[in-house]
């Protein structure tokens, strides 16, 4: 995928683990992401990055680092998981962003790259996404990416049970 003027997406590499460990060790990231434990375990980023290859080979997930072209830093993760293939191919879009990079538009740019990757390289026809009701910034990103809002649903994540806003996009 061609980068935007500010960000590129690429597979994570082992050298990203220190930056990822720092970013996800912030309680605010764990709170809004919902699937990141807090406190984040020592060495957790290294283990998480090492798991990506098996998920990709199994066809269950596409996980990418979002890199700032301004400073070369890994600033976030974006993924499509719960992938299904075939006639009704679909997946679940998820992302988290390091706190220093919040409210700067990086999510929308990286999301556009991931949607292009899903449609062109993986022939996906539909993506779904969700965010906790107390995280409206994620909803704004999804709306800017052209996702349509569905009925809210109660869901459980690592932080507990919450009401989530749900979305879908036909690619």
Task: Enumerate the predicted regions with their spans.
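Acyl-donor (CoA/ACP) binding surface of acyl/acetyltransferases
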Residues: 1-28, 63, 67-171
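Conserved GNAT-fold acetyl-CoA-binding loop/helix
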Residues: 30-51, 62-64
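Short loop/turn motifs at secondary-structure junctions and domain boundaries
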Residues: 55-59
């Amino acid at each position: 995928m061609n980068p935007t003027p500010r960000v590129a997406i690429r597979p994570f590499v082992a050298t990203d683990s220190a930056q990822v460990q720092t970013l996800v060790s912030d309680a605010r990231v764990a709170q809004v992401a919902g699937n990141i434990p807090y406190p984040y375990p020592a060495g957790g980023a290294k283990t998480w990055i090492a798991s990506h290859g098996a998920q990709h080979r199994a066809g269950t997930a596409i996980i990418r680092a979002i890199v700032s072209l301004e400073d070369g830093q890994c600033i976030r993760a974006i993924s499509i998981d719960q992938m299904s293939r075939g006639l009704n191919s679909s997946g679940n879009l998820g992302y988290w962003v390091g706190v220093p990079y919040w409210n700067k538009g990086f999510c929308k740019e990286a999301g556009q790259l991931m949607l292009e990757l899903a449609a062109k390289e993986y022939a996906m026809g539909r993506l779904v996404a969700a965010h906790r009701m107390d995280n409206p910034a994620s909803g704004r990103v999804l709306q800017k990416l052209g996702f349509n809002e569905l009925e809210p649903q109660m869901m459980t994540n690592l932080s507990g049970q919450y009401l989530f806003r749900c979305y879908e996009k036909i690619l």
